[in-house]
Every structure is written in C-alpha cells, then in structure tokens.
C-alpha cells in the first residue's frame, strides 16, 4: 500500500511537471511574417456618411521561430487614424498587447481597410504598416491599398430623364435603382459603372446608352480588379419590366451579373423592347440575355460565358440577331444543355404546357459555339407558331427536329477563336467563319468599329 501511494505521488508529480509552461523568452525575438507586404486591390473610397465600402478581409500569419513562449505586441503605425483595421487572435484595435505565441507556432492577423476620399480622379495609393514586437525587436508588414473616388448612387428612384455624363470618376451603385415609366435614363460615352452585390437596375421607362468604339459604356461588379473581370454573380443585372420599350444600348460592355439583361413582354406601342448594337454581355451566372415574350434586336453583339444561357427567348416573342457571336467556354456552371434556347411555351414541374405564345426568331451571319454537342435548345408547342428564319450561321448542333436547313449553314466546325478559354472570341486565320456571310446584310462595321469587307465574316468580329 505504501508503494502504491508512492507510485501515485510520483505519477502526479510528473504530470504536474509536464503541464508546466516553458519559461517565457524575455529577450528580443524576430517574429517571421508570412509576407513582407500585404496588397489590397483597388477599393472605392467611402461614400460620405456611410461605412461602405469595406475591403475583403485578408489574412497573414506571424510565426514565433523560437523554442520558447513569447508575448508579442502588435500595432498599426498609423494608429487610430489608419485606414486599416487589424484583429489578432480575436483581439481588435490599432494597438494590441501581450499576445501569447507558443514555441514554433503562429498567430493569425486579420486585416481590412476602408479608405477616405482623396479628391483624385485616378486611384491613389494608401500605405501603413503592422508592427510586431517582442523584447524591443520589431518586425514589420507593409499594408498597401489603392483608393478610388466615385460618384455614389444608393437605393434610388432616378429623377425623370437622368443623364450620367461624368467620366472623371466612376459611378458606384449601391442597392436597387429604378427608371420610372415615361422617363429615359441616358448614359454618355466613356462612363464607367460599378454595381454592388445587391444591385438590380429596374426599368419601367427606357434606356439610352450610347457609347462609341473608343469610349464604350462599362458596367460591372464593384470590385475593380482584373482578378474579378470574368467572375459571375457580382451584381443582379438589368431588368426591363413589362411595358418598357425602345431602350437602346450601343457600344456597351456589361459583365459579372447574375442575369445580364432580362426583358419582359412585348412593348405596347410597337418597336423593340430593346435594341443592342456593338454590345458585349458576358460572365453571367444564369443568362446573358433573357427575353420573356419580348421583342429584342441585336446587331454585332457578343453574348458569352454564362451558367445556363447566352441567349434565352422564353414563352414566345420576336428576336432578330445579326452578326452576333454566342459562345460559351464551359467555365461558368456545369450545364448539360445548349446555351441558345427558344421556346413558345411554358411548362410546369411535370412537363405539362401551362401557357403558350407565338415565337419568331431570325438569325443571320451568327456563330453559336460551345463545348456541348448540342448548343441549341428548342421547345415548340404545335398549337402556336414557332417560326425560325435562320441563314448563314456557324452552329454547334445535331439539328434534331430538322429546324435548320443544311444548305446555308456551317454545322459543327471549330470557328477557331483566338483564345476562348480567356473569353477572346476574335477569329483566327483559317476560320471557317471568314467570308461566309450573306451579302444581303448591310452591316458595315464589326463590334469594335472595324470595317467589314464583302463577303462579311460570321459573328461579331471581322477577321483582320
């Protein structure tokens, strides 16, 4: 019994000793950051009176290289006035004291920034540093961000006949915007627009957006970085509501939306709901362009790279496409069906037709290309018209149902785009689309303003 008690006492002593923390290292220690500079992409400066926008949160680790515990202090060199914010192991503030770091272990530092207006028309750099100290020795991580002033529009019903003409700084839309019925929203050449994640532009009136080849109108998500150029679902999109009409988009570049442009219902007074010329709509989560019993004309347009559809004509409508390229590289979504779709009916979840409307679609001198064997989807109810007038197109299709005459189309040949995986759909030398266009069209320039020569090339780009 005495031996057992002695054994237990010895065991408890060993456990107690093993649980004791190694002694603190009091002398100077050079902590090891995972990077010497933390870069933030361009960030819009703050809207006056608002915390918007705030950057994404970036993370760095700072390692204790020693075989002993240390206590580290962290500080922003800019103090309370810094544009940056830090959080170390759950403790936030411009100055954080006594953070314990185990031997050969690391702590994580979370960094955000929000930038004050700088009164510049171009992005201006903002710098600060994180200082990490142990025993008087300092390690430094430089923080760098570019701040860009903007004209802000937030949750607005636009005044009738609003015109955006300023090109000194971009416009940033935060929340939804509405164009009232009977009003026109005009945008001048060269205007840049960035839309937040919860932005949808609703249109009861009409749009008059007319850029030029050298000064297109651009609208995209509100993270101005080349890394996000081709990412979908950064904002909602443009929604032309029922009874809107006669909207026109020329030389526009619309990207990064969930649904690029949705158009509802035939216009009351004739004409088109939407006419697009020399316009690009790309990198959309659902569809680039979707018409619901709408009337849409597109000339020299590029609709590319969407989760489901580059073009959708749903429940009838009238659609006229000339010299358009509709292409998908398969990098957005995992669709199993064609990205160009037309239907004169609407079905319920059991596949039963619940509504029908006549459909008429003309397509001339266009390209429809993608990674599927069949890039067309047609759903035609025999009870109402489903009229197609297709000619002189290059299409990836099995032509099931025999909707397209084989005599004046090119089926299932590689159009030889320059770099489709990078979203570049210009034609290369030797493309079967070169000089194959109908001579009856009178389109004198391509999407970029380059002069077309007879016979024209198919698609939105003339080979040069």
Residue ranges and their predicted role:
Residues 15-18:
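C-terminal motif of bacterial Sec signal peptides marking the signal peptidase cleavage site
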Residues 1-4:
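Positively charged n-region of N-terminal signal peptides that target proteins for export
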């Amino acid at each position: 019994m005495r031996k057992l008690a002695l054994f237990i006492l010895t065991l408890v002593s060993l456990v107690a000793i093993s649980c004791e923390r190694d002694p603190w290292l009091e002398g100077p220690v050079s902590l090891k950051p995972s990077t010497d500079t933390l870069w933030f992409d361009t960030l819009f400066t703050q809207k006056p009176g608002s915390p918007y926008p705030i950057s994404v949160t970036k993370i760095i680790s700072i390692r204790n290289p020693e075989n002993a515990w240390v206590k580290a202090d962290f500080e922003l060199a800019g103090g309370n006035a810094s544009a940056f914010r830090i959080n170390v192991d759950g403790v936030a503030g411009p100055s954080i004291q006594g953070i314990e770091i185990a031997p050969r272990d690391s702590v994580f530092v979370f960094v955000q920034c929000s930038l004050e207006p700088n009164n510049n028309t171009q992005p201006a750099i903002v710098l600060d540093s994180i200082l990490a100290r142990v025993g008087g020795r300092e390690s430094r991580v430089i923080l760098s961000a570019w701040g860009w002033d903007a004209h802000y529009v937030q949750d607005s019903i636009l005044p009738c006949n609003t015109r955006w003409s300023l090109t000194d700084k971009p416009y940033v839309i935060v929340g939804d915007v509405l164009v009232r019925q009977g009003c026109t929203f005009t945008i001048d050449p060269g205007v840049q627009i960035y839309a937040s994640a919860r932005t949808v532009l609703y249109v009861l009136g009409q749009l008059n957006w007319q850029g030029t080849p050298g000064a297109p109108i651009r609208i995209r998500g509100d993270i101005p970085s080349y890394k996000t150029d081709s990412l979908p679902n950064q904002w909602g999109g443009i929604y032309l509501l029922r009874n809107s009409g006669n909207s026109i988009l020329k030389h526009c570049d619309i990207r990064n939306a969930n649904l690029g442009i949705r158009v509802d219902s035939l216009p009351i007074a004739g004409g088109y709901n939407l006419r697009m010329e020399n316009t690009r709509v790309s990198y959309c989560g659902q569809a680039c362009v979707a018409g619901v019993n709408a009337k849409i004309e597109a000339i020299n347009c590029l609709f590319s790279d969407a989760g489901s559809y580059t073009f959708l004509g749903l429940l009838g409508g009238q659609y006229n496409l000339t010299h358009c390229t509709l292409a998908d590289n398969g990098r957005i979504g995992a669709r199993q069906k064609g990205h160009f779709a037309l239907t004169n009916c609407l079905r319920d979840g059991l596949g039963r037709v619940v509504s029908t409307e006549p459909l008429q679609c003309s397509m001339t001198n266009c390209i429809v290309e993608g990674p599927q064997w069949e890039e067309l989807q047609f759903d035609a109810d025999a009870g109402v018209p489903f009229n197609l007038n297709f000619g002189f197109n290059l299409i990836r299709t099995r032509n099931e149902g025999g909707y397209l005459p084989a005599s004046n189309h090119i089926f299932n040949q590689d159009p030889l785009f320059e770099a489709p995986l990078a979203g570049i759909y210009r034609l290369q030398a030797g493309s079967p689309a070169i000089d194959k266009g109908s001579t009856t069209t009178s389109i004198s320039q391509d999407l970029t303003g380059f002069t077309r020569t007879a016979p024209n090339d198919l698609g939105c780009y003339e080979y040069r």
